[in-house]
Amino acid sequence: MPTQTDSFEPLVKKSRKRASVRTMGCRLNQSEGVALEGKLREAGYDLVPFGDPADLGVINTCTVTNEADAKSRNTIRRFTRKNPKATTVVVGCYSQISANEVAMVDGVDYVIGNHDKLNFLDYLSEEKPDSPVVVRERIDREDFSIGLVGEAKFEQRANLKIQDGCDFMCSFCIIPFARGRARSREWTDLLADARQMINKGVRELVLTGVNLGTYQSGGRDFLAMIDGLSELEGLDRLRISSIEPTTIPEELFPRMADSKHPLMPYLHVPMQAGCDRTLKRMKRRYDLEEMDAFFKRATANIPNLCIGTDLMVGFPGETEEDFAKTCETFVDGPFSYSHVFTYSEREGTPAAKSSDQVPMEQRRRRSAHLRRLSSSKRMDFHTGHEGREMRVLLENPKDGSYFAYTDNYLKVRVPVSPQGLENRIAQVRIGQAFPEYCLAELFDWESS
């Protein structure tokens, strides 16, 4: 059985050991995965691709759905089968919520929750433990610091963690239990990290967290934080990853509308449902009338605005009429795409206790239908840009093409000609639209 402990011998560094990190789930977890890799490099490890032979494996897990739990377990088993003598460390949200369940997976040595995730090396002893060691502390509510990214490596676009946790307690959501209550990253720590990322060549920072709009640290709210980052020399682009609709300050609108401002004209707003009855049961903090008015103001004031959303299908009590209303709201709304999620019961949430569960077959059928609608909306978004001239940030070439995103988050594919233009701002002419991207022709770019 797993043992609980809070006292460990520190890890003795050994040169040139190999470590492998696999991060699952959301953009916030991806951001923390980069930090984990940086800490391993600082400790003297060589980072190798997941699946290659390794002395240490770190699996950074997700628990947002039952499927995420299953994927996490499968990933752990895949690593331990490939590396039976390696030390296996499982961190993240699945470790926080279901530590003992994780510890029962064959081959797991350490199970470390979110409070201590980024300090996991402090808990490793020189020898593999006889039984899994579980470290799952209560998550503090105070503002936090992470420290500089150090040896972390970045490409042209990088995630910048500014916030963690959530107080909204929607009836379906496990994240407040996995991530704790809302808290913000200390401004000076955040600013120093952003500066170092820019010095490493990052041109676009993507703000990440659980509930970004609740940011509040050192007298700075979300808007003041945006303004502070926007003043950084060398930062070309600033993008908000996802933000709760009731926390969006409309003072952002003129900043997004200004083509010379770093803040990009892009909003990903997780509506979760397009039906008032379902929104109320979810304990969301708005209704359709409020959201319709907000979106009309946003699109009227921000040219070329891209609005994405999340929609959950099969929430307890959702009728065919409720689902039809959600589809209508999405199709008629200003959305460019939706991420569609099939509702998954999470133990400990109010929704999981409902006697009104929708049969899984119906959930999957509805999800498939809404995904088809989303594909159609995305294609409309793509075709609506054909023939336009737009600004992009060229990323590393792959398969003979640069991939890039416009300011409003349209993905484009540009032939690599000339070469050596990665990480430059360029002008492209949008050509033929495809479901996943648009072809584009390069006609101007900044000098090196």
Name the predicted role of every residue range.
Residues 1-208, 213-214, 267, 288-296, ...:
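Proteins enriched for Cys/Gly/acidic motifs involved in redox and nucleic-acid/cofactor modification
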Residues 6-7, 20, 353-448:
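Terminal RNA-binding accessory module
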Residues 107, 257-264, 332-336:
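Glycine-enriched alpha-helix->loop->beta-strand junction motifs that scaffold or abut catalytic
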Residues 153-156, 166-168, 273, 305, ...:
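Short flexible coil/turn linkers enriched for glycine and charged/polar residues
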Residues 88-89, 97-98, 199-320:
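Conserved SAM/AdoMet-binding glycine-rich loop
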Residues 234, 252, 334-335, 350-354, ...:
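Conserved N-terminal phosphate-binding loop of PLP-dependent enzymes in the Aspartate aminotransferase
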Residues 170, 190, 207, 240, ...:
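Conserved, mostly hydrophobic/aromatic
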Residues 68-70, 181-186, 216-220, 280-284, ...:
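Short, solvent-exposed loop/turn segments at secondary-structure boundaries
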